[in-house]
Amino acid sequence: MGVEYLACGNIMSDRIQSEDGSYSEWNMGGPAFYALSGMRIWTPQVKLVCKTGADYADSYGRWMDDNGVTRESVRVELEEHTRYTLRYNRDGSFTPTPHFSMEHLGYLKTHADDIDEAAAGCRIKGMYMAHNCDAV
């Protein structure tokens, strides 16, 4: 049986900076990865469609391999995937610090052609798409 569901969009990792200056481990995330994880609970016929950095392989790639998810439509375009450090304040608010430029984020967006290529030859039943609007 082939792929039936696509999770399209970005993946990103976060780490927490505590008040004492210490850092948590990097935590996998991003809307497309969360969607993929949820889909995978119900079926192995899922595929992640995204552009990312080569370092994704050590965490996201390993998770995908361990959970029987193909890496076929993950396009490595840069050295590092999107990452943020979140510094939490006593009131529960936080300040995100990106480890990339906005050009980086725009460059890694999933486009319609990426989705068409990922869906070719598949009988797609559903798709999740995470994509923010660009300013015009």
Descriptions of predicted regions:
Residues 1-18:
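Positively charged, low-complexity intrinsically disordered leader regions
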Residues 3-7, 28-32, 108-113:
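Short, composition-biased local secondary-structure segments
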Residues 7, 127-130:
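Redox-cofactor binding/interface segments in oxidoreductases and associated redox assembly factors
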Residues 13-21, 25-26, 43-128:
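Conserved N-terminal subdomain of the carbohydrate kinase-like
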Residues 21-37:
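Short catalytic helix/loop segments, enriched in acidic residues and glycine
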Residues 40:
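Gly/Ala-rich phosphate-binding loop of Rossmann-like dinucleotide-binding domains
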Residues 132-136:
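Short acidic/polar capping segments at secondary-structure boundaries
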